[in-house]
């Protein structure tokens, strides 16, 4: 098979893995030094970093052959799809060629399981090692780690990759047993623990070799089973707490041609995936717990965002006096983000906050109005019941512009 044909197959096969954001890696550059590449965003941009940089990654599988038969996966053993396999040398060549053409800033590399977990992990490491040592490539590298691989291989991968990740796959162990019986939650979490241990050791010892400086992430498939959002968020919360993950990515299940009856024939609403990302951001950045966002079983509402849903369910905290409230509570007001909350706190050291200041800070006034008090404003909507406010603030369908 020609290299271009392999690329067509294995780039398409990698599209279902969404955990490829190049985030948190220290900036490195070969400018003025020996070597090749940089982690600075340039060229065609596809992924966004937390500081706003855009980076383009070559996102491929080493192979889509796989020993496992996960029911939700397009590359499962029983799937009738075109198969291909790169050699490590071919991936190195592609990465360097794309970089020299200014098409990418880094590499995201995953793989189906071939021969064994250790053999597959060795092949992935071989790519990263050659890029770093033989070609002095200083761009971003994200490697998928293989559950059940030897911890020594995980440690070696961390020396060459900016980020490592291992997919938790599904929100519950029972779903994993039913849909991917060849995988075990224990081995997945053991790999997460190995990565976390490597990060901890690298931070504790100044002279320790670098180890995945952008941390680790994971991916959870949404809608392949009946798990509700409350369980999903509690699972994510546990992963953040136990293994200090940088990100949990949520991927709405995509129906696969000729898929088994054990998985749905319809995809979940993409808006559900979006709401989970919003809720996840509130847990990571705003101090919300999963129990606050969903106090019981069920899914996040689709018509309003999770922050607004929390505010409507906790009206006793509102309206908030912006001239007196704690910064953490100001950040929980719908329509006011972390940065705006910090600016408001800084501003009130100089003067009393007025409603026009919210406009200047570009807060979302429609959302914020029912929940804030300023020197010259007190909401008339504050006494309205939550159901009425929800109806007014819900994100209803909008007519698309014709041009």
Where are the predicted features?
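Conserved, mostly hydrophobic/aromatic
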Residues: 57, 70, 109, 166, ...
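Residue-level signature of tetratricopeptide-repeat
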Residues: 347-348
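Short Fe-S-cluster ligation motifs
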Residues: 94-110, 279
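Conserved AdoMet/S-adenosylmethionine-binding subsite of the radical SAM
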Residues: 92, 96, 115-293
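Flexible, acidic/Gly-rich N-terminal and inter-domain linker regions that tether
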Residues: 1-65, 372-373, 380-394, 400-403
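Canonical Radical SAM [4Fe-4S] cluster-binding loop centered on the CxxxCxxC motif
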Residues: 60-89
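C-terminal extensions
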Residues: 300-329, 355-403
